[in-house]
Swiss-Prot record:
Function: Part of the Sec protein translocase complex. Interacts with the SecYEG preprotein conducting channel. Has a central role in coupling the hydrolysis of ATP to the transfer of proteins into and across the cell membrane, serving both as a receptor for the preprotein-SecB complex and as an ATP-driven molecular motor driving the stepwise translocation of polypeptide chains across the membrane.
Membrane topology: Peripheral membrane protein
Protein EC: 7.4.2.8
GO molecular-function term, one example from the UniProt record: metal ion binding
InterPro entries: Helicase_ATP-bd (IPR014001), Helicase_C-like (IPR001650), P-loop_NTPase (IPR027417), SEC_C_motif (IPR004027), SecA (IPR000185), SecA_CS (IPR020937), SecA_DEAD (IPR011115), SecA_motor_DEAD (IPR014018)
Annotated protein name in UniProt: Protein translocase subunit SecA
Natural source organism: Francisella tularensis subsp. holarctica (strain LVS)
Name of the gene: secA
NCBIfam families in the record: PRK12904.1, secA
Cofactor, how bound (note): May bind 1 zinc ion per subunit.
Family matches, as SMART domains: SecA_DEAD (SM00957), SecA_PP_bind (SM00958)
Length: 906
């Protein structure tokens, strides 16, 4: 019934395309009129549109004219005319949706339409790509169009200094990577002067490869961190001990004889010790003198040892050289499992990177303490409007809509897509599969057909390369080890009988043109004459026709990826813009996807039914594969959804802190803010020693006096005052405490330079807030890591997490207020030498931060010398008494820690 209705009225996607086609017709009707305009008249349109917006007109009304303007500018500056389907894509992006556009349909050109329209408001447009190369390339390619129309274009890449970043963000349209935009947001919320902040409002963002950024990278938050204590000795110790542990093939074993020391869960990439393993590692640690004879690993004080052990166990059992990482220049370089790209400068978290460094015998770098963090899910929600482009979003439409509120619209291709997708072939073993791939390649290149082979790992690409060399088949390899040659390898991939092996082509961002890349060939000529160019074009046309006759580019997948989307991205490299093409996947029952997620009984039946070299290729197996991929996709979706639910708790707190911090930063004078905080602190302090409505006999006036003296440098004899006038009630005493704190502060600062005092007040607020927020993030991390244990007590971990996170946040805010007022109570005029020393120490402490993408760290830091020169000048003020830390003995002499005595907030 549903299919019948769809045939009559069309699907939702078809109805949407039909609706926006009317807008496209209007844009097309304007083309003759805009073609008649002079360059100056066309350029003047930008000023006209901005005036109309200022007078109350809305962007939707301007859209047809603005798109017609960009189309005409594209024709004049780039000799590129936006097709009708590209106009549809632009409308989809303007409306805050995801446009699924096949490879070769010109997504880079499409982005110019909504980018120009939305930049007319003056609030800026961000265009996000997956790497620096694509950001630079796209900005350079499209800058002629934007600049012709009077729009400024900026690019954010890793090596820019703060001033260059600020200038790039001030442009009408700014290109850059998701990591750079996210890290700049976090750094801006760590700045100590307004001038150090580089970003402006987050108005409208267009995300290229939106599925890769919002889904593949959503599980790993962006983190700004600073180095913590050196723990290389412990990693080296456990790295030496872990190889003595034996692996158990599955979690449950039938008898004790089969039990080993640990087992792994490949789905979640975790390793777990058995009871036998715990006993074995405890004995080894006791022999090493790390554990006492009567001690055990379950003890709370050994939690850090368990951290090192688990990290090393995962490093040895789950992460493999040339598959998950490579060693380059004595450093561990992560390989992105989705794209196959090496990611230099990035690091795994939770001690895993240090454990792998120990495993491979390279220098172990210190772990890091979180100073600021955010997930991509919550970062992009900060924008007023989000839009995205990709070649493969439909399979992830549910997640994009449920988490980001983004609707996916499939854009028709400009020319019909004629790729031929063959059935998968499944073999009993990996070797048989690779032999079949080699024979297929041999047959295809014999007729001049170019072949692109997609592999899931560097190891697989090198195995296949070795087999091809034995057969004397010429080929190129593109993986994380050959990343420098990427552009030239891709440019050659469409040549007749060319063979290219690539590790996960997803996100490569370069079209493979049949016959080779003509533009690259022309660019390589030195001072070419028109005759040279004509000859190159003629030769290219011959090659192009020859490849088309041979069947176009053939895509061969050496195994199925966990996600159907990544497989579709690989397939999408063939048959661009109406060209012919083919695709085929070769699998074995030993491939990770089928081994981990297909049922064991089915796998055994298939293996028994296959004789040496035989394969299966029919619909039933396609269903099995799709079902296995569906399991993986569902599993990963649940992880991302779960991460978001937990991060939303911290995100609410982050918004409060960052908004409060920004108000401190922008205020010229924070004295009114501090006056309000002093009232809160006086109230808090008073009720620590005098419970509301309690009897006089229960008042601890002596303790209150000691706290006033040690924390606020105030001598106030409350007991004497009460003895002299026993009519003084609770409210009277509270007022005396409040007035004493206020008067003492006025007296302390009345003879100081007011500018220096105001500067120090702001600095103290920001520094104290940052310190407490950083400690709070650490507490939240510990809470998050342990909260699932509450399930054993029949409690809902998420509800417990929300409740305790709120309590931690409330306590953190109270402690922040108390400490900042206590700090300000101890200031005095400092010498010039002391001022310089304090300033230098602060600059050094802030120059050591790193930007991480949890699995991943970006070491391109923005805290260079230019920024340090702008650090807050803490002139003429310093503490009079020593700062009391929360874990120090309380100065009152009780013997308790400060946080449990006078630093305690009920």
């Amino acid at each position: 019934m549903l299919s019948l209705v769809q045939k009559i009225i069309g699907s939702r996607n078809e109805r949407f395309i039909k609706k926006v086609s009317r807008i496209v017709q209007k844009i097309n009707s304007l083309e003759p009129e805009f073609e008649k305009l002079s360059d100056e008249q066309l350029k003047a349109k930008t000023f006209e549109y901005r005036e109309r917006l200022a007078n109350g007109e809305i962007l939707d009304n301007l859209l047809p004219e603005a798109f017609a303007t960009v189309r005409e500018a594209g024709k004049r500056t780039k000799n590129m005319r936006h097709y009708d389907v590209q106009l549809i894509g632009g409308i989809v992006l303007h409306q805050g949706k995801v446009a699924e556009m096949k490879t070769g349909e010109g997504k880079t050109l499409v982005a110019t339409l909504p980018a120009y329209l939305n930049a007319l408001t003056g609030d800026g447009v961000h265009v996000i790509t997956v790497n620096d190369y694509l950001a630079k390339r796209d900005a350079e390619l499209m800058s002629d169009i934007y600049e012709f129309l009077g729009m400024s274009v900026g690019v954010i890449v890793a090596d820019l200094n703060p001033q260059q970043r600020k200038e790039a963000y001030a442009c009408d349209i700014t290109y850059g990577t998701n990591n750079e935009f996210g890290f700049d947001y976090l750094r801006d919320n760590m700045a100590y002067e307004k001038e150090q902040q580089v970003q402006r409002s987050r108005n409208y963002v267009i995300i290229d490869e939106v599925d890769s950024i919002l889904i593949d990278e959503a599980r790993t938050p962006l983190i700004i961190s600073g180095a913590s204590d050196d723990s290389s000795e412990m990693y080296n110790l456990f790295n030496r001990l872990v190889p003595y542990l034996e692996k158990q093939e599955k979690e449950e074993v039938e008898n004790e004889q089969e039990q080993r020391d640990f087992y792994v869960d490949e789905k979640s990439k975790n390793a777990y010790l058995t009871e036998k393993g715990y006993a074995k590692i405890e004995n080894m640690l006791k022999k090493e003198g790390i554990l006492e004879e009567d001690d055990n690993l379950y003890s709370p004080h050994n939690i850090t040892k368990m951290h090192y052990l688990n990290a090393c166990l995962r490093a040895h059992s789950l992460y493999q050289l040339n598959i998950d990482y490579i060693v380059r220049d004595q450093e561990i370089v992560i390989i992105d499992e989705s794209t196959g790209r090496a990611m230099p400068g990035r690091r795994w978290s939770d001690g895993l990177h240090q454990a792998i460094e120990a495993k491979e015998g390279v220098k172990i770098n210190a772990e890091n303490q979180t100073m600021a963090s955010i997930t991509f899910q919550n970062f992009f929600k900060l924008y007023n409007k989000i839009a995205g482009m990709t070649g493969t979003a439909d399979t992830e439409a549910f997640e994009l809509h449920s988490i980001y509120g983004l609707e996916v619209i499939i854009i028709p291709t400009n020319k019909p897509m004629i790729r031929k997708d063959h059935h998968d072939e499944i073999y009993g073993s990996v070797r048989e599969k690779f032999d079949a791939i080699v024979e297929d390649i041999k047959e295809r290149i014999s007729k001049g057909q170019p072949v692109l082979v997609g592999t899931a790992s560097i190891e697989a690409s090198e195995v296949l390369s070795t087999l091809l060399k034995k057969k004397k088949i010429r080929h190129n390899v593109l993986n994380a080890k050959q990343h420098e040659k990427e552009a030239s390898i891709i440019a050659m991939a469409g040549y007749p009988d060319n063979v290219t092996i690539a590790t996960n082509m997803a996100g490569r961002g370069t079209d493979i043109i049949l016959g080779g890349n003509l533009e690259v060939e022309i660019a390589q000529l030195e001072d070419p004459t028109p005759e040279d160019i004509a000859q190159i074009k003629a030769e290219w046309l011959k090659r192009n026709e020859a490849v088309k006759k041979a069947g176009g580019l053939c895509i061969i997948g050496s195994e199925r990826h966990d996600s159907r989307r990544i497989d579709n991205q690989l397939r999408g490299r063939a048959a661009r813009q109406g060209d012919p093409g083919e695709s085929k996947f070769y699998l074995s029952m030993d491939d990770n996807l089928l081994r981990i997620f297909a049922s064991q009984s089915m796998a055994e039946r298939v293996k028994k039914g296959l004789k040496g070299g035989e394969s299966l290729a029919f619909g039933f197996m396609s269903k099995v594969i799709s079902k296995a991929q569906g399991k993986v996709e569902s599993y990963h979706f649940d992880i991302r959804k779960n991460l978001l639910e937990y991060d939303n708790v911290v995100n609410t707190q982050r918004k409060v802190i960052y908004e409060q911090r920004q108000s401190f930063l922008e205020a010229e004078d924070v004295s009114d803010i501090l006056a309000d905080i002093r009232i809160d602190v006086a109230e808090q302090l008073f009720h620590d020693y005098v419970s509301a409505g309690s009897m006089h006999e229960l008042w601890d006036l002596e303790g209150l006096e000691k706290a006033l003296k040690s924390d606020f440098m105030i001598e106030l004899d409350l007991q004497k005052l009460y003895e002299e006038d026993d009519s003084l009630g609770e409210e009277d005493l509270k007022r005396l405490v409040r007035e004493a704190i206020e008067i003492e502060f006025v007296e302390k600062t009345k003879n100081l330079d007011s500018g220096a005092v105001r500067q120090f007040e702001k600095f103290s607020l920001l520094q104290s807030l940052d310190t407490h927020w950083r400690e709070h993030l650490s507490s939240i991390d510990h809470l998050r890591n342990s909260i699932n244990l509450r399930g054993y007590a029949q409690k809902d971990p998420k509800n417990e997490y929300k409740k305790e996170a709120f309590e931690l946040f409330s306590t953190m805010l109270d402690n922040f207020k108390y400490e900042v007022i206590s700090s300000l109570a101890k200031i005095r005029i400092a010498t010039e030498e002391e001022t310089q020393r304090a300033q230098q120490e602060w600059q050094e402490s802030m120059s050591d931060i790193k930007a991480e993408h949890e699995s991943v760290i970006d070491n391109n830091q923005r805290h260079d010398e230019d920024e340090q020169e702008e650090a807050p000048k803490v002139q003429q003020v310093r503490r009079e008494g020593p700062k009391v830390k929360r874990n120090d003995p309380c100065p009152c002499g009780s013997g308790k820690k400060y946080k449990q005595c006078h630093g305690k907030v009920e």
